[in-house]
Amino acid sequence: MSDSKEPRLQQLDLLEEEQLGGVGFRQTRGYKSLAGCLGHGPLVLQLLSFTLLAGLLVQVSKVPSSLSQGQSKQDAIYQNLTQLKVAVSELSEKSKQQEIYQELTRLKAAVGELPEKSKQQEIYEELTRLRAAVGELPEKSKLQEIYQELTRLKAAVGELPEKSKQQEIYQELSRLKAAVGDLPEKSKQQEIYQKLTQLKAAVDGLPDRSKQQEIYQELIQLKAAVERLCHPCPWEWTFFQGNCYFMSNSQRNWHDSITACQEVGAQLVVIKSAEEQNFLQLQSSRSNRFTWMGLSDLNHEGTWQWVDGSPLLPSFKQYWNKGEPNNVGEEDCAEFSGNGWNDDKCNLAKFWICKKSAASCSGDEERLLSPAPTTPNPPPA
């Protein structure tokens, strides 16, 4: 029995050595059979468990290192993001503050220079209304009167409390003073009027109502005085080259026509130039009227003479119509007829033309602030 057991034990030892030498189910002599392997199952499971445990320990040993590295990277990224956020926030706020400050500075400067829309419109309308009136102010004496008014206005403005407005109005008055000193051109007169209008607009914005009212009254008086400044001709008269002409709407004989003109400080028209002749001939032909002029040969037949005693110049004889004067039936007085002159009987009733010099607007200085003079009545029409 003992001899038989020993060979079996030797066989088992050889089998275990083969199993241990081929871990992972590999045998040097090849696989015996699936049943043989399963017969040694506990040993195989132990080997597998040992292998898995060793691999797990290796992996677990690596985890703290990778975790610590990831955490440090996260911390670094978070710190960088925080710093970047702060930097961007500061940069944005500073740039916006600078931009807003610059815009406010520009806006403040622009608003400080611009007047209100309503004031601009008021200035423009006032300027338009008075421009025509000031345009007829040709005399230096009248400009001097306006300058005196401006001087009084300047003194009143100087008492007002708002310094900035005082300075602005004072500068306007200074410019007005220089403009008035330069005199009668219409452009200068218009400039004066514009400055007066701007001054009125500036005064309207002042807080002191009593002073404002005082200055406003001065401006109203000055405006009225400018509007009353003399017109070259009375109403219903026509201005031409320094003279005024009245064309009647009724008819009289030649002698009564002379009287009608004298009653208004004029005379039956005496023609002095070719331009005047053309102007008067046009007026008469437009109305299709026969109109007396101040020319006759009553003193000496065939010698034509004006009512002021001056003779008819040879150059004017061209204005007679063809065949005239013919002195048919004692035709001793001249008239405008069609496109030229004609002689006719002096006792016939016709329209007439009066002539006198235009006003020079150089009367007393008191006229500026005195009531408007009454317009001379035209001769009976």
UniProtKB/Swiss-Prot annotation:
Ca(2+) binds at residues 324, 326, 328, 331, 342-343. It comes from the Eukaryota. PANTHER family: MANNOSE, PHOSPHOLIPASE, LECTIN RECEPTOR RELATED (PTHR22803). The tandem repeat domain, also called neck domain, mediates oligomerization. Gene3D superfamilies: Mannose-Binding Protein A, subunit A (3.10.100.10). Residues 360-381 are annotated as: Disordered. Glycans are attached at residue 80. It comes from Macaca nemestrina. Keywords: Adaptive immunity, Calcium, Cell adhesion, Disulfide bond, Endocytosis, Glycoprotein, Immunity, Innate immunity, Lectin, Mannose-binding, Membrane, Metal-binding, Receptor, Repeat, Signal-anchor, Transmembrane, Transmembrane helix. Residues 59-381 are extracellular. This is CD209 antigen. InterPro entries: C-type_lectin-like (IPR001304), C-type_lectin-like/link_sf (IPR016186), C-type_lectin/snaclec_domain (IPR050111), C-type_lectin_CS (IPR018378), CD209-like_CTLD (IPR033989), CTDL_fold (IPR016187). One of its GO terms (cellular component) is membrane. Homotetramer. Interacts with C1QBP; the interaction is indicative for a C1q:C1QBP:CD209 signaling complex. Interacts with ICAM2 and ICAM3 by binding to mannose-like carbohydrates. Interacts (via C-type lectin domain) with CEACAM1 (via Lewis X moieties); this interaction is regulated by the glycosylation pattern of CEACAM1 on cell types and regulates contact between dendritic cells and neutrophils. GO terms for molecular function: D-mannose binding; metal ion binding. In vitro, is a receptor for HIV-1, HIV-2 and SIV and transmits viruses to permissive T-cells. Pathogen-recognition receptor expressed on the surface of immature dendritic cells (DCs) and involved in initiation of primary immune response. Thought to mediate the endocytosis of pathogens which are subsequently degraded in lysosomal compartments. The receptor returns to the cell membrane surface and the pathogen-derived antigens are presented to resting T-cells via MHC class II proteins to initiate the adaptive immune response. Probably recognizes in a calcium-dependent manner high mannose N-linked oligosaccharides in a variety of pathogen antigens. GO terms for biological process: adaptive immune response; cell adhesion; endocytosis; innate immune response. It is found in: Membrane. The chain crosses the membrane at residues 38-58. Residues 240-355 form the C-type lectin domain.
